[in-house]
Amino acid sequence: MATNDLFPPEPPLPDPAHVAQLRRALHEHAHHYYVEDAPTIPDAEYDRMFQELQAIEAQHPELITPDSPTQRVGGRALEQFASVRHAVPMLSIRTETDTEASGARNFDTRVRRELGLDEAAPAVAYVAEPKFDGLAMNLRYESGILVQAATRGDGEVGEDVTQNVRTIGQIPLRLPADAPSILEVRGEVYMRRDDFEKLNEQQRARGQKTFVNPRNAAAGAVRQLDPAIAAQRPLSFFAYGLGEVTPEQAGGPAFGTHYELLQALKTWGFPVSALVGLAQGATELVAYYESIARQRDALPFDIDGVVYKVNSLALQRRMGFVTREPRWAVAHKFPAQEQFTTVLDIDVQVGRTGKLTPVAKLAPVFVGGVTVTNATLHNEDEARRKDVRVGDTVIVRRAGDVIPEVVSVLLDKRQPGATEFTMPRQCPVCGSAAVREEGEVDYRCTGGLFCSAQRKQAILHFAQRRAVEVEGLGEKLVDQLVDGHVIRILPDLYRLGLTALASLDRMADKSAQNILQALEKSKQTTLPRFLFGLGIRHVGEATAKELARHFGSLDAVMDASLEQLLQVNDIGPIVAQSLRTFFDQPHNREVVEQLRACGVTWQEGPPAPVTPTPLSGKTFVITGTLPSMSRDEAKDLIEAAGGKVAGSVSKKTTFVVAGTEAGSKLTKAQELGVAVLDEAGLKELLDGHS
């Protein structure tokens, strides 16, 4: 026999770069999920990536690093709230990878193996409960009084959200006299589906942003910095476990099973789900799983699976923990719900900032408890990657039970002649050119002043304080003006009359007169403010000032060639092309001319001579409160002397101008060795260059 047959080569090590990339991706997605409450991928995909990393590290323990996502529980605490170190870590529960009912049998088999039970041994007793889709919470009571509520955070350190949690009616603020002197109750803060729908109706009525799902709404309420706002959000709570508790030898409770613990929670005044059940062995676990799956869509709250726990606390202690999770519990998720449907059309929608998004219009299909008729294709690259075409039969998944997506196309069912989707090169709303800039994935409409899809955003941007400044013209008033068809295009602002304004909801004559006076006042502006107010992509305040200084007049800016634009200080190819594209659209030029005809005016002068300014090439950052001038005034002085004002400190920063309560920007400047000036130092610098 050959040597190679006797000693087969070991399988190759995984690519370290792939392992590192997997960790980075998991960290990033965990941050979006736990900290920002804005998940970027479906739960199922995160679980798949996590399980891949777990498998690699199990095969190759030498690749485990202290910062691996497998070595900790979840996200990290937000900085806005005080940090709380948990007396007993809030560990997460392992997810069963088999999302069929057989996954319950897998868990029972694993438990029996861990406990060394043979086939003749009695069935293991379990507690089974729904896996609530909310926010994990730790409630700490001392001498029967709620003294602290904290989120899971990273399992070791969470966020102190006591004031907000006190507003939840289901959570007792005082416990009965027989409750332990130290008691930490763990459970889930969630929002009922009917409460979620009512909340979104209220948000729509106020013209405010609606919430994506009950979990995000609940998490957002708990993390509100203003408890008064949190109190207006209808939150609920289910208790399912304990943290730190007065020990038995010090007079604390003595439980033999997890189920007894849950019954005690009820007697102390905590809500425990009526769906919690006892199960003997694998067969009853499977029956419980199937029963909850059937009830899922009819439940008044969202769940995404069930949780099984060994009932005996003695057996729990015997089984113990592994790394980040208990061996005696598992989360058994439901399968991602998928259905077949047909693509009826592919529409391109235009967002309020001009972004074009392809959307598959679907034959109605019931997925994940809702009827789905649309699925985003995100952008041209994604649409091409999936190659979705009109008439295709596709698999649609309500991924993570939240976001409908087209998973794949059944190519064998594709009809002959189905044409490939291409993004339009004109805006489907206004007909202006749609442009995809180098390095970007999105197409954007260039008719920002004319496009009805961008109308509200264009008006708000034009009227803001840093542009022409129309005092009192806020989002709610703009909503009324646009939705009521009072304003079609930007110049219509200056055609408003008292009668039209006074007829709006909650608009008295005096308020209407104030708006008209503010509009009249805004007509006297400056060229930099006007240019900034046009909302040209990539043209901020500093760029607008450079354009005005360089060309002197609006007509010169509008007619400048790419080559001429590139001669302006701090303007590169992307900004130059953005300017040229904007002013090449006849719609945009027409709006500009109408604004001038309505009386919007400014002083113009000759182009600035090409001479170096005193602070040319120097970058400033202003932080804190200055004694005798506002930050805007300091910014104007610096820019008038040719300096540039940035929003963040970097190695390229020349000076940081620091007032009182300067904060992190001053700290970073000191770390980087950037020169720091106070107001007197800034004045001295400006005087020295005047």
Curated annotation (Swiss-Prot):
Belongs to the NAD-dependent DNA ligase family. LigA subfamily. Keywords: DNA damage, DNA repair, DNA replication, Ligase, Magnesium, Manganese, Metal-binding, NAD, Zinc. GO terms for biological process: DNA repair; DNA replication. Its cofactor is Mg(2+); Mn(2+). InterPro entries: BRCT_dom, BRCT_dom_sf, DisA/LigA_HHH, DNA_ligase, DNA_ligase_AS, DNA_ligase_CS, DNAligase_adenylation, DNAligase_N. Pfam families: BRCT (PF00533), DNA_ligase_aden (PF01653), DNA_ligase_OB (PF03120), DNA_ligase_ZBD (PF03119), HHH_2 (PF12826), Nlig-Ia (PF22745). Its EC number is 6.5.1.2. Residues 610-690 form the BRCT domain. This is DNA ligase. Zn(2+) binds at residues 427, 430, 445, 451. PROSITE patterns: BRCT, DNA_LIGASE_N1, DNA_LIGASE_N2. It catalyses: NAD(+) + (deoxyribonucleotide)n-3'-hydroxyl + 5'-phospho-(deoxyribonucleotide)m = (deoxyribonucleotide)n+m + AMP + beta-nicotinamide D-nucleotide. One of its GO terms (molecular function) is DNA binding. DNA ligase that catalyzes the formation of phosphodiester linkages between 5'-phosphoryl and 3'-hydroxyl groups in double-stranded DNA using NAD as a coenzyme and as the energy source for the reaction. It is essential for DNA replication and repair of damaged DNA. NAD(+) binds at residues 43-47, 92-93, 129, 152, 188, 309, 333. It is an enzyme of class 6 (ligase). The active site is at residue 131. It comes from the Bacteria.
